[in-house]
């Protein structure tokens, strides 16, 4: 049996993988100072902005006023013991672009938020080479 690998992914590959998915975990600081991690459905526009929609009264709506956030997306095969993970960091603001994200819940599309990504890191791992 050959040994596995744990390799960093370059930013271009991270962006490609991020764009290949539609659900991520969004992390940000709550008004109480706790770190919240919530799932969001998203799309990536042509200028590398991650875009999602939310209700006007939800906890995510305040991100439209400018917040530092992190987004994590992955694909893991427990059966094959391999996968990848991408972590993106950026600044969230109200989005004015052309991408229309698909909200999963009716009425949760009142506020559209874009995250201008300024740092992308990722890793690919496998138990077997």
Describe the role of every protein-language-model region:
Residues 2-5, 70, 74-129:
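Charged, gly/pro-rich active-site loop segments
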Residues 22-24, 36-38, 48, 65-69, ...:
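A generic structural signal for short beta-strands and their flanking turns/coil linkers
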């Amino acid at each position: 049996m050959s040994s596995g690998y744990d390799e960093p992914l370059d930013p271009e590959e991270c962006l490609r993988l991020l764009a290949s998915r539609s659900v991520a975990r969004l992390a940000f600081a709550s008004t109480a100072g706790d770190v919240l991690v919530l799932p969001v459905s998203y799309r990536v526009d042509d200028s590398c902005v991650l875009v999602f929609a939310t209700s006007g009264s939800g906890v995510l709506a305040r991100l439209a006023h400018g917040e530092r956030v992190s987004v994590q997306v992955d694909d893991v095969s427990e059966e094959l013991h391999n996968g990848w993970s991408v972590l993106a960091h950026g600044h969230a603001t109200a989005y004015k672009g052309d991408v229309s994200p698909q909200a999963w819940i009716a009425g949760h599309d009142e506020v559209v938020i874009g995250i201008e990504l300024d740092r992308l890191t990722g890793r690919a791992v496998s138990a077997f080479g």
